[in-house]
Curated annotation (Swiss-Prot):
GO terms for molecular function: ABC-type molybdate transporter activity; ATP binding; ATP hydrolysis activity. Part of the ABC transporter complex ModABC involved in molybdenum import. Responsible for energy coupling to the transport system. The gene is modC. One of its GO terms (cellular component) is plasma membrane. This is Molybdenum import ATP-binding protein ModC.
């Protein structure tokens, strides 16, 4: 468990958060520029000393302002990845990695050289120097070097912000591998919804130095009282379990979490039991009173209306739905709501027109 109570005030900005975060997953600190994301990270790292703070990683206290405890940054078992990798230009990639590795006694190493280079796909780069690497390659080396310090916590401050869309798409699969294969907790700062949707298990939504929400990403994205629900990309994350594959039509069947309901997505074959993360946008769900088998829409689920919220314009409303325990959002017109008589507790059918596979 990660506990971070942080309070500080500067001219024109104040931070006041109390975060209780899981100790094994990827937590995204999400919000607009100036919301306090990087300040939180710097305080946790000890690079910024908050006057009032309590920071504990599992059983290790890094700061307790009431008791006068402050562990300096270099003694905190953490890795920090910045927007641009700060590599030593005069050293090869291998020497840069060894610099991180040699700081840790052999008995305390949780990640070795082979594991780090394979996870980040940089084995073929070891003899090169940083000036001969692309931006994405430099960032992967920087992440590998941070991992080789065997951190108890990995802090990533917008690691893809300096990369173009092509380089981002190249590096995201490697970040997903870190998520899937390592047990190191990660705090990931970003203002890009696509990155957060693909990587995060837990979401902290920050605004003006305060945490508007903190919880599992699926539940948090489905909250109608948060500004994320008003975004054009509003929707929910579903992590389904593969339960079947139709080779003729190249369709995977995914079982929804804790439910007997399924959705189908176009995808390459996967092994039964594997998990696949998807996003269903609110704009891609329509509602109907009855199920229609004579439809080109593959995914039709029985749902219950939970609540309603006005959208960002007078013509639409947002409807929160429950599909066997999985939350969904639907963005429909006020006219359609009135025609269907939509109200909390009502049973309807959700027609999902598109499912975005996050891979």
């Amino acid at each position: 468990m990660i506990n971070a109570r942080l309070k500080l005030a500067w001219s024109g900005f104040s931070l006041d958060v109390d975060l209780q975060l899981p100790g094994r997953s990827v937590t995204a600190l999400f919000g607009q520029s100036g919301s306090g994301k990087t300040t939180c990270l710097r305080c946790i790292a000890g690079l910024e000393r908050a006057p009032q703070a309590f920071i504990r990683i599992n059983d290790e206290v890094w700061q307790d302002s009431e008791k006068g405890i402050f562990v300096p940054p270099h003694k905190r078992a953490l890795g920090y990845v910045f927007q641009e990798a700060s590599l030593f230009a005069h050293l090869s990639v291998l020497a840069n990695l060894q610099f991180g590795l040699k700081r840790i006694a052999k008995a305390q190493r949780r990640v070795d050289m082979t594991q780090a280079t394979e996870l980040l796909g940089i084995g073929h780069l070891l003899d090169r120097h940083p000036q001969h690497l692309s931006g994405g390659e430099r960032q992967r080396v920087g992440i590998a070097r941070a991992l080789l310090t065997s951190p108890r916590l990995l802090l990533m401050d917008e690691p893809l912000a300096a990369l173009d869309s092509q380089r981002k798409s190249e590096i995201l699969p490697y970040l997903q591998r870190l998520h899937d294969e390592l047990e190191i907790p990660v705090l990931y700062v970003s203002h890009a919804q696509d990155e957060v949707a693909r990587l995060a298990d837990h979401l902290v939504l920050l605004s003006d130095g305060k945490a508007l929400a903190c919880g599992p990403i699926g539940e948090t994205l489905a909250r109608l009282d948060l500004p994320l629900a008003m975004d054009n990309d509003a929707g929910v994350i579903i992590e389904g379990q593969v339960s079947g594959y139709d080779a003729d039509y190249q369709l995977l069947t995914l079982q929804l979490p804790d439910s007997s309901l399924n959705i189908r997505v176009t995808h390459a074959p996967m092994t039964t039991g594997q998990r696949l993360r998807c996003k269903v946008h609110a704009r891609d769900i329509s509602l109907t009173l009855q199920n229609s088998e004579f439809s080109s829409i593959l995914n039709r689920l029985p749902v219950t209306v939970v609540s309603e919220q006005p959208a960002d314009n007078a013509a639409h409303v947002l409807i929160r739905l429950d599909a066997g325990g999985t939350p969904l959002l639907a963005r429909i017109t006020r006219y359609s709501r009135d025609q269907l008589g939509v109200h909390p507790g009502q049973s309807l059918w959700a027609q999902i027109k598109a499912v975005a596979v996050l891979a």
